[in-house]
Amino acid sequence: LLSILNIWPETAFLGVYPRDKSVIQELSQRFLNPNKNEFLFTGTISNYENNYYNSALLLNSKKEVKNIYSKNILVPFGEFVPFRKILPRFDFFENKIDFSSSYQINPIAINKYYKFVPLICYEILFSNLIFKSLDKEISLIVNITNDAWFGNTIGPIQHFQFAKIRAVEFGIPVIRVANTG
């Protein structure tokens, strides 16, 4: 059975799951063919028990969320402020809400033949996240990212170089989708 995987970058969809479930279902309806075995993997924010996560959803063409992955390794001062609770008087940072870490990584199955390891943003730098999934017969590494905050620096190029290193290191194809190209 042929499966089509569409991949959007980290910040392509700014809704919050499950709060914006109807909007997420509309994404499936607008961008996936209901007569085909199509999937959309896209970045989003998720909220569970008053914790926010930098996440990615796998939607199918039947408007269902088939899987959700939440980021394990957060960017300090970008996604959380270290020691915020210990040093509250130094609370001069713009982001008032910290993202939470997931602490788990499981490959996402597209069908019975293909599984991929999802990585968000700079998680591609940490090979231990991939090592945890090697025994689960993964066929692909998918890295979605928003490199726009790097601006006109060498950052996006270095980030891309790490993705290439992971492909060589593990002998597994890496698909990297960035909102800046």
Task: Label every model-predicted segment.
Residues 1-181:
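Enzyme catalytic cores with a strong preference for nitrogen-chemistry domains
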